[in-house]
């Protein structure tokens, strides 16, 4: 079980003070120095940011076949965390490949670079104290190990959305499985490319058996924020 720091109620005035104080200190320091670079040695630590947010940063790495429910569960979890006053950020294929990874294709090299960039971005969020959810097929152990190495073993929690391919194909919201069956999509995971199931995930959820709400409850229990 992963334990998050529970949020603490703060008055609005205290919150504003917390935002103003570092700016005042930094402005005073800059006025007495000609070179700004030494300031980076005094950047706020991860612990400082987690204390401000009253939570711990963590990486929930959702892996599973296309259509398994990764993004759906991630969005539902984000809403529940938000209700509890916890800051969360979702990274998934749609918002990443339309922006920072728009120049990448689906070759083996590009898939690896896609995951590498996602992990580097995720690490920045985690180091800021944000609960970060990545929803990517990430079909091989090698790719998931790469992400873990970048983010850090203690922060990286592998969540396997283990919905069977039959159910994923039945859903086929984007029509990708049908296109892959017709040979229109090459190297499609589960059809023309393999998926290596995680051997020791922190949590495994089969959305063909568990409703989304129940899946989210398991995740909240895992995070100790029920």
Residue spans for each PLM region:
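Extreme N-terminal, non-catalytic leader segments
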Residues: 2-3, 8, 12-15, 19-59
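ATP-dependent NMP and nucleoside kinases share a basic, alpha-helical "lid"
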Residues: 99-106, 122-180, 187
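Conserved beta-strand scaffold positions in the cores of enzyme catalytic domains, especially
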Residues: 90, 156-160, 202-204
